[in-house]
Structure formats: structure tokens, C-alpha cells
Amino acid sequence: MKTQIVILFISMIMLQMFVQIEGGFWGSLWEGVKSVVGKRGLRNLDDLDDLDLDHLFDSDVSDADLRLLKQMFR
């Protein structure tokens, strides 16, 4: 009987540790889903589609930058 109680106690501790670790992951995943599926999230995605991607990612690379990159990758 003592062995069963000890095994039960240890398994409960291990289960609690697992739930606490996974709770952060599942919480983050749920927040991401809520932000995408919610009304504001969908509205923000529509606003993102209206923008030109060139405005989001500025790709101004000067000749000096290109020379430096070529030297780095030799």
C-alpha cells in the first residue's frame, strides 16, 4: 500500500510539472489563434493586404553594401 501511494504521489508531481511546462506553450498558441481569428485580427490582416510589401520591407541596398556582402561571402 505504501508503494502505491508513493507511486501515485510521484506521478502526480510529474503530471503537474508537465502541465505547467505545456501550459505556456498552449497559452501562446491560443493567443496566436485568437489574434488571427478575432475581428481585430482579421481586420489587421486585411489592412496588411492593402499595403504594398515594398513599403514593409525596405530593400535599399547601396553599392557599398553590395561590395561588403561580396567580400564577406568570398
Curated annotation (Swiss-Prot):
Expressed by the venom gland. One of its GO terms (biological process) is defense response to bacterium. Keywords: Amidation, Antibiotic, Antimicrobial, Cleavage on pair of basic residues, Cytolysis, Hemolysis, Membrane, Secreted, Signal, Target cell membrane, Target membrane, Transmembrane. Its main location: secreted. Residues 1-23 form the signal peptide. It is found in: Secreted; Target cell membrane. One of its GO terms (cellular component) is other organism cell membrane. Residues 41-74 form a propeptide. The keyword Oxidoreductase does not apply. The modification Valine amide is found at residue 37. Antimicrobial peptide that is rapidly bactericidal against Gram-positive bacteria (MIC=12.5 ug/ml against S.aureus, and MIC=100 ug/ml against M.luteus). Is also active against clinical antibiotics-resistant bacterial strains. Is highly capable of inhibiting antibiotic-resistant pathogen growth, including methicillin-resistant S.aureus. In vivo, shows high antimicrobial activity on a S.aureus-infected mouse model. Belongs to the non-disulfide-bridged peptide (NDBP) superfamily. Short antimicrobial peptide (group 4) family. This is Amphipathic peptide CT1.
